[in-house]
């Protein structure tokens, strides 16, 4: 086996391991956790020796005073003085660190708000149009790099394929709080501005096509890229996001 093939296999195995860790984490019930000794970076600036405490569902307290950290931990049933999970400086970032019901020492690592992405088509060689497995791997790739929530962008395809892809996104949302919904980039694009989209699949947004997509989405459609200059483009701008009654 060539060296490049071996490296590719190792990469795929590493990605699958991380995706499995994400699956396990999402399947577990929410539990309190805390992170301490982090370098916090957000819109307010940079702060050293920062900590965060969550009850499992929401952040309940943040700060940089040790006494306040102990009190915040106690409020969610954690002991700030127990041995904590550690994030070593040599950690490659390819594994999820810490655990539910734990106190994690960030060892000076950076802590930022989770990113929310509203336009990306995939990651790690997988597309959000590639079904449940494709979404699973692509979301793991984004999650590893800090995107905690995401609107999944779907490209122009035959209408029945786009409807099926919307149904897949809708079906995953109940078990995947990290999936915020779907973004349709197409099929209602101008031929002159189509980019890499298949021109054979581009359509004018007549009510029939719009209703089919809305029905398939089941309420998961968050945004759609359209060309308002199309014959029915302006009409689409005034369309309710809920499908019309049959």
Short names for language-model regions:
Residues 3-75, 84:
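N-terminal metal-binding scaffold of metallo-dependent hydrolase/deaminase domains
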Residues 76-79, 107, 165-176:
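Short amphipathic alpha-helices and their capping/turn segments at secondary-structure boundaries
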Residues 121, 136-165, 178-191, 217-231:
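Divalent metal-dependent hydrolysis catalytic cores, especially in the metallo-beta-lactamase
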Residues 139, 166-170, 210, 237:
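Generic structural signal for well-ordered alpha-helices
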Residues 190-215:
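Conserved phosphate-binding/catalytic loop of the ribokinase/pfkB sugar-kinase fold
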Residues 205, 218, 231-237:
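Acidic, metal/ion-coordinating pockets
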Residues 238-246:
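Single conserved hydrophobic/aromatic residue that forms the stacking wall/gate
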């Amino acid at each position: 086996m060539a060296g490049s093939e071996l490296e590719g296999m190792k990469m795929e195995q590493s990605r699958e391991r991380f995706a499995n860790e994400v699956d396990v984490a999402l399947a577990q019930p929410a539990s309190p956790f805390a992170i301490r000794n982090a370098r916090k970076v957000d819109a307010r600036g940079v702060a050293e020796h920062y900590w965060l405490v969550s009850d499992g569902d929401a952040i309940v307290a943040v700060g940089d005073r040790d006494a306040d950290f102990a009190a915040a931990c106690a409020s969610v049933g954690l002991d700030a003085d127990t041995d904590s999970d550690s994030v070593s400086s040599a950690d490659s970032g390819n594994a999820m660190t810490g655990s539910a019901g734990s106190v994690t020492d960030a060892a000076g690592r950076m802590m930022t708000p989770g990113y929310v992405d509203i336009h990306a088509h995939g990651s790690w060689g997988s597309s959000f149009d590639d079904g449940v497995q494709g979404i699973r791997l692509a979301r793991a790739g984004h999650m590893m790099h800090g995107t905690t929530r995401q609107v999944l962008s779907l490209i122009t395809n035959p209408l029945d394929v786009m409807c099926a892809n919307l149904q897949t996104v809708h079906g995953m949302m109940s078990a995947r709080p990290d999936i915020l919904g779907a973004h349709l980039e197409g099929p209602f694009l101008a031929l002159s501005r189509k980019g890499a989209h298949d021109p054979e699949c581009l359509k004018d947004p007549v009510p029939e096509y719009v209703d089919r997509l809305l029905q398939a989405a089941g309420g998961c459609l968050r945004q759609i890229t359209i060309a308002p200059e199309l014959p029915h483009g302006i009409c689409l701008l005034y369309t309710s996001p809920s499908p019309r009654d049959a």
